[in-house]
Amino acid sequence: MNIGDVMFQLFVFIIFAAVVFAAVTGFKYAKNRKAQLDRIEKKLNSLSEDHD
């Protein structure tokens, strides 16, 4: 195997790992964002009920 083949395989592996990492990070972000919005909605509802 020459150095060009090794570099190409390493490059492809890094790209693949970056795509997987981005997907996992995106799903975690979306999940945390939804939980945060749910907490805010709950807090606003409780403030609205207290005001009435």
From Swiss-Prot:
Its main location: membrane. GO terms for cellular component: membrane. Keywords: Membrane, Transmembrane, Transmembrane helix. It is found in: Membrane. The chain crosses the membrane at residues 7-27. It is a single-pass membrane protein. It comes from the Bacteria. This is Uncharacterized protein YqjU. It comes from Bacillus subtilis (strain 168). The lineage of its organism: Bacteria, Bacillati, Bacillota, Bacilli, Bacillales. The gene is yqjU.
